[in-house]
Amino acid sequence: MGLDMYLTKRTYVKNWKHKDDKHSVSVKLNGKKRKDIQEDRISEIIEDVMYWRKANHIHNWFVSNCQGGVDECQEAIVSLDQLKELSALCKKVVDDKNPGLMQTVQGFFFGSTDYDQYYYDMCTETHEVIEKLLKEMEDEPKDVYSATFYYQSSW
């Protein structure tokens, strides 16, 4: 019980007859192709990019910047620009040791509101994961279907 937070990446991979570009997706279990999953029916791949536990300052940022201030455990689209902004802010918080840049928030089992080592560790980890993600995106050809990112929390 408590604040659980998820960032996911969804990549559209549906193959259309009228398109020349084709994705290839294979699902195997113990090296054997899954017969209950038809590759030609796969249209989207969902990746779990990051999971946080009781990082209420990160949650507060998503609520304020991606959810229009509404905190009802709803799923919210997160743009690449927003991810870049969050990454830069997390880095600045750690580099400047300035917790005033990213406020903690109280909530139902949201964890500590102290600006302690866990607070800074979550900022560091968030920055590192987003930077790695942005690098992965940068290396992809610009003409492929782009991914969409989503944030969701539960408690």
Language model: regions and residue ranges:
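Acidic (Asp/Glu-rich) sequence patches and key acidic residues
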Residues: M1-W155
